[in-house]
Amino acid sequence: MRDMEEVREVKVLEKPWVEKYRPQKLEEIVGQEHIVKRLKHYVKTGSMPHLLFAGPPGVGKCLTGDAKVIANGELTTIGELVERISNGKLGPTPVRGLTVLGIDEDGKLVELPVEYVYKDKTSELVKIRTRLGRELKVTPYHPLLVNRRNGKIEWVKAEELKPGDRLAIPSFLPAMLNDNPLAEWLGYFFGNGYTDSEERVVFESKSKELRKRFMELTRKLFQDAEIKEDSGKVYVSSSEVKRLVKSLNKDSIPEQAWKGLRSFLRAYFDCNAEIKDKIIVSTAGKEIAEQISYALAGLGIVAEVDDKGSVIISDPENVSRFLDEIGFSVEEKKEEAKALIKKSTLNLGIYVDKELISYVREKLKLSFYENETMWSPEKAREIAWKLMKEIYYRLDELERFKKALSKSVIIDWSEVEKKKEEISEKTGISVNEILEYAKGKRKPSLEEYVKIAKALGVELKETLEAIFTFGKKYLGYVISDEIETLEEVRKEELKRLKELLNDEKLKKGVAYLIFLAQNELLWDEIIEVEKLKGDFVIYDLHVPKYHNFIGGNLPTVLHNTTAALALARELFGENWRHNFLELNASDERGINVIREKVKEFARTKPIGGASFKIIFLDEADALTQDAQQALRRTMEMFSSNVRFILSCVTGDTKVYTPDEREVKIRDFMNYFENGLIKEVSNRIGRDTVIAAVSFNSRIVGHPVYRLTLESGRIIEATGDHMFLTPEGWKQTYDIKEGSEVLVKPTLEGTPYEPDPRVIIDIKEFYNFLEKIEREHNLKPLKEAKTFRELITKDKEKILRRALELRAEIENGLTKREAEILELISADTWIPRAELEKKARISRTRLNQILQRLEKKGYIERRIEGRKQFVRKIRNGKILRNAMDIKRILEEEFGIKISYTTVKKLLSGNVDGMAYRILKEVKEKWLVRYDDEKAGILARVVGFILGDGHLARNGRIWFNSSKEELEMLANDLRKLGLKPSEIIERDSSSEIQGRKVKGRIYMLYVDNAAFHALLRFWKVEVGNKTKKGYTVPEWIKKGNLFVKREFLRGLFGADGTKPCGKRYNFNGIKLEIRAKKESLERTVEFLNDVADLLREFDVDSKITVSPTKEGFIIRLIVTPNDANYLNFLTRVGYAYAKDTYARLVGEYIRIKLAYKNIILPGIAEKAIELATVTNSTYAAKVLGVSRDFVVNRLKGTQIGITRDFMTFEEFMKERVLNGYVIEKVIKKEKLGYLDVYDVTCARDHSFISNGLVSHNCNYSSKIIEPIQSRCAIFRFRPLNDEDIAKRLRYIAENEGLELTEEGLQAILYIAEGDMRRAINILQAAAALDRKITDENVFLVASRARPEDIREMMLLALKGNFLKAREKLREILLKQGLSGEDVLVQMHREVFNLPIDEPMKVYLADKIGEYNFRLVEGANEMIQLEALLAQFTLIGKKK
């Protein structure tokens, strides 16, 4: 068994064989000779027609070299950048560590990595000019992001652009905008400075303020400067200034000025700005004008550049932003500029797609309406946000409707008829009326129908409300309350609702609005498009994922490299992976992956000099109509919702179940695959996992980094993995040492462990219930006078006897038979003649009675000559009907039993308090130790022992704060209990002679079964102070999970919170009062609690203090940081105290890490530095106090320094919406490792090592791609010989024994699919190294074909019962679903020895019953009905 477990573990982590044994060369591709032949021809000729192309082969999407780009934060030209990296060579050149600015799928500005740069030549270009002075020269096929007059936002080829289209430009750019004296001096010099014939620098200005400022800066910056002022001019003589000025070129912003752009711009504008109806700055030429435009964009100021090289700021918003961010030093210019804010001249608005927005409004019945087609950027964001708020509400409402409409409104009238008395009692409808409804004689009203359904346990309220509301609100009609039509209406509405939610145009419209609401773009109108001919050198940058960057003469959103698609390994050699993509288009769950991969793959240039790429669409012949439409749409637009993950965390990273059990993500994979864990914790609380993946990070090209936080938390993740930070989601690449991330304080130390034990011993609990029944005046036999008074165990005895008597009725005696039997002796043989005289009946009549007595086994007869003798074998009783059984039971047990009760007993039914309690306990609380509900039960029990008590009337009371009780009530509901409303009362008490008034809060639960269960767990009824406390045995014997939750409930109720002041905490304890008679038991209880705490490495002590009324026993958690940290992060509190306690724990964690990890490192550096210098210098360099350094030199023990934050400061500055802001203190690159990730259904995040992780690879929501052409290779199924050959090769490599039977079984299931065959082989190998047909069918969840055929033939031959038994055997043996069975029946029906018309008929029937299953019909009933159809058709033939 150990060997088997080891093998399974390896299989979880091993690369799937379907990838491991993928064909590496064209020669290895089998069964596709027609394709291989064509592909080899393409290899030979280098030509590739009839495949997906994003542009004509050999033509890239590129820019001319003078286009500007911000690379690694510096402004340069793309030509200079690419030439420097590529050393002038044509084609692609890989590059690392280069980043540019671009936009994400929401139109937000982000820093993006460049994968490679590209240089090429072309004979055609398109020149584009815009209203704000942008001038771009790009290849005709270069896509640009534009807003067209019809409102669409899309990537359009340059050659297709028209005047009036609006080009996307960023609303701001990050830049170096700090103040800097030298940059300011350069601004003055570039603005109004020059060099005279004596090589002096001259600054000329009418403003006395500017001349004074220029002189101040000159004295400060240049020590040898001689300054003279004369007639509005300042003359500077200095060798330093002379050298500086000679190195400058006034045509561009100098390198020194980029370090303080704000200062440079202010000085430059002070000198050169002219203010009329706009701010106009004359420059030395277009180069510096364009650079100034980029610099202004760093502050979100959009500027125009005219043909003369003037920079123009005209829009009031941009003028206002200029004054706020840069401003003028000259007061006169400042006032003139302020006057411009009232005017509006610049139009950077966006055309909106009114038709698409109207479609969304109509479909989702939105109230908001706006008629204009041109919106300003601010208006677009404002309106889109208003619409999105409504949309979120509507989509949430529709999801609720979908859930409600998925439930049928049809009830089972046969079940109603069986339970008519019970239903009548619950509903108040008479039994006769219910019978008439059940038999169809009368129709109930809708109100009565709902009541009857509710009595059956079917809740129809939500479904009916959904039917009426959805119909009226979204479909525009009012539905009658005729029950006959409701189910049809429900089905139709559910169909319409699903169509609405899957409406691609609606999804596109919602995505469009999201883009409008979130983008950070403006739109510059194109005024001229001109085609150029000649010989041009062109350049481009490849930016993976988002495929765009900010560049151009003025900041513009540009698309990166896209080229044709190409072939395979032989064609591309070592570069084949960059140029080849294989997709499975038929997998419905993979449609979104197809969209994303096609989009990203088609945008990159081929590597290695090839002219095109190729996309393989595997199993294209299996594409459904929906899949074909989805694939077509993917080629046309970017919109999709990708749920696969490419960026992940390492295997040691811990994720958390919703009840905060931690599990290493590598182990989670196994639990998830086996169905043990289906949910994890994330930002929204709990979320369902829909996918989990593992692979080596090298596959996606992202190395793994280790991040260490100031709390000591460590996490390892790929570079593109995203974590939640105070500024939003950030990739690991972008997180630096000193960066801040958000941490969700989580409990730790309690692992998820599969534990199949159940928490209740049902046999012991049933025996305990006798005590409960006796308390309710039920009695055992010999004490009870009637059956009703009996305890349940004795009712069971009578039930068994009643069933025995029912079995004897067939052989029971009539009154006359009993009389004759009484006359016959058991000791001696009596002659028949003598018996005839005693009985006084005729010989014939006596012979008939004797024959019956002999047949029933009461007598035996023998014949001697002509005489016949009779002897009794056993006694008998008159037993022919229920009344006879009633009489016998009353005689044997000595109690009165009603006739109605006897009838119930004879039908096998018995009722009793213990049965009712046991049934409810089994249904609600008989769970495994690893079940989440076990933790809730433990938590509630802990709370009851603290702030609850059991009343004698079966009620359970809880007393606490209102907030605490509201949280507790949620747990009680999860247990299937119905807590009361919270009761609020005034209270008063006296403390040291002083009256104190307040309010108390209570709630209660009335549930006899839960009350009995708590008593079984030794929770006492009444006053616990007098009776004492006990830790339930099931808790003591349980796993860490239930022990932790019990402690949390107990401390949540009765524990005190930690009291913190500045750096330190104390005060965590439990305090319980006891009387003399309960003292020993209470102390034992707290000793047990202390033992439980020790399992979490928490130390505590117990004290006993006498009082006037008795004793106070305290359990005190030992007050030191390490112990408190263990308690708060491993145990903690349930309910209201929980949040505060977690924050205290996180503070202590940071404090201890600072004290034990960070400070020792600083101390070591302090000693080293102070030894070679002095204490004062060391303190200044390290940023600590001098006392700290001196104490380290003295060898004094390290303590918290005064500059460490206090707890009060932590709560104020570090806590954000329940998260803790923590700094990254160390970042290390680990290289390529095996990584893991999970994907959640509702929110793309999960908690990992306390950090909030994102399922990083989400896709674009709105931007549309270039139209593409595609011709698909059609792959046919492989023949069995080809698959068998490959399987034998794999089996040999893996050391497997592949039997012939096992091989044939795999071939049968694979149906020509090589990947399916390999996957089945790998799965079977996890069971046994010998591959047999038995383990193949087991892992594939398939029945043997011969079993399916046998079942169908039995039915066709009229042997329905045996066919039915065979069906049940298949379902139980193989664990198949009904649909699985139908699929195999459909396949095997064509292999039956019957004529073709019958095969056609049966195939049609199988399809009909499959449809019924899809519609939600009962599996077993439908499968048996299908076999019945087989039987009927067989008889007809």
Swiss-Prot record:
<dbReference type="InterPro" id="IPR027417">
    <property type="entry name" value="P-loop_NTPase"/>
</dbReference>
<dbReference type="InterPro" id="IPR036390">
    <property type="entry name" value="WH_DNA-bd_sf"/>
</dbReference>
<dbReference type="InterPro" id="IPR003587">
    <property type="entry name" value="Hint_dom_N"/>
</dbReference>
<dbReference type="InterPro" id="IPR010982">
    <property type="entry name" value="Lambda_DNA-bd_dom_sf"/>
</dbReference>
<dbReference type="InterPro" id="IPR047854">
    <property type="entry name" value="RFC_lid"/>
</dbReference>
<dbReference type="InterPro" id="IPR030934">
    <property type="entry name" value="Intein_C"/>
</dbReference>
<dbReference type="InterPro" id="IPR006142">
    <property type="entry name" value="INTEIN"/>
</dbReference>
<dbReference type="InterPro" id="IPR004860">
    <property type="entry name" value="LAGLIDADG_dom"/>
</dbReference>
<protein>
    <recommendedName>
        <fullName>Replication factor C small subunit</fullName>
    </recommendedName>
</protein>
<dbReference type="InterPro" id="IPR004042">
    <property type="entry name" value="Intein_endonuc_central"/>
</dbReference>
<dbReference type="GO" id="GO:0016539">
    <property type="term" value="P:intein-mediated protein splicing"/>
</dbReference>
<dbReference type="GO" id="GO:0005524">
    <property type="term" value="F:ATP binding"/>
</dbReference>
<dbReference type="GO" id="GO:0006281">
    <property type="term" value="P:DNA repair"/>
</dbReference>
<dbReference type="InterPro" id="IPR003959">
    <property type="entry name" value="ATPase_AAA_core"/>
</dbReference>
<dbReference type="Pfam" id="PF01381">
    <property type="entry name" value="HTH_3"/>
</dbReference>
<keyword id="KW-0235">DNA replication</keyword>
<keyword id="KW-0068">Autocatalytic cleavage</keyword>
<comment type="function">
    <text>Part of the RFC clamp loader complex which loads the PCNA sliding clamp onto DNA. The complex possesses DNA-independent ATPase activity.</text>
</comment>
<dbReference type="InterPro" id="IPR006141">
    <property type="entry name" value="Intein_N"/>
</dbReference>
<dbReference type="InterPro" id="IPR003586">
    <property type="entry name" value="Hint_dom_C"/>
</dbReference>
<dbReference type="GO" id="GO:0003689">
    <property type="term" value="F:DNA clamp loader activity"/>
</dbReference>
<dbReference type="GO" id="GO:0016887">
    <property type="term" value="F:ATP hydrolysis activity"/>
</dbReference>
<dbReference type="InterPro" id="IPR027434">
    <property type="entry name" value="Homing_endonucl"/>
</dbReference>
<dbReference type="InterPro" id="IPR001387">
    <property type="entry name" value="Cro/C1-type_HTH"/>
</dbReference>
<dbReference type="GO" id="GO:0003677">
    <property type="term" value="F:DNA binding"/>
</dbReference>
<dbReference type="Pfam" id="PF00004">
    <property type="entry name" value="AAA"/>
</dbReference>
<comment type="subunit">
    <text>Heterohexamer composed of four small subunits (RfcS) and two large subunits (RfcL).</text>
</comment>
<dbReference type="Pfam" id="PF14890">
    <property type="entry name" value="Intein_splicing"/>
</dbReference>
<dbReference type="InterPro" id="IPR050238">
    <property type="entry name" value="DNA_Rep/Repair_Clamp_Loader"/>
</dbReference>
<dbReference type="InterPro" id="IPR008921">
    <property type="entry name" value="DNA_pol3_clamp-load_cplx_C"/>
</dbReference>
<dbReference type="InterPro" id="IPR036844">
    <property type="entry name" value="Hint_dom_sf"/>
</dbReference>
<keyword id="KW-0547">Nucleotide-binding</keyword>
<dbReference type="GO" id="GO:0005663">
    <property type="term" value="C:DNA replication factor C complex"/>
</dbReference>
<dbReference type="Pfam" id="PF08542">
    <property type="entry name" value="Rep_fac_C"/>
</dbReference>
<dbReference type="InterPro" id="IPR013748">
    <property type="entry name" value="Rep_factorC_C"/>
</dbReference>
<feature type="domain" description="DOD-type homing endonuclease 1">
    <location>
        <begin position="185"/>
        <end position="301"/>
    </location>
</feature>
<dbReference type="GO" id="GO:0006261">
    <property type="term" value="P:DNA-templated DNA replication"/>
</dbReference>
<keyword id="KW-0067">ATP-binding</keyword>
<keyword id="KW-0651">Protein splicing</keyword>
<comment type="similarity">
    <text>Belongs to the activator 1 small subunits family. RfcS subfamily.</text>
</comment>
<dbReference type="InterPro" id="IPR036388">
    <property type="entry name" value="WH-like_DNA-bd_sf"/>
</dbReference>
<feature type="domain" description="DOD-type homing endonuclease 2">
    <location>
        <begin position="940"/>
        <end position="1098"/>
    </location>
</feature>
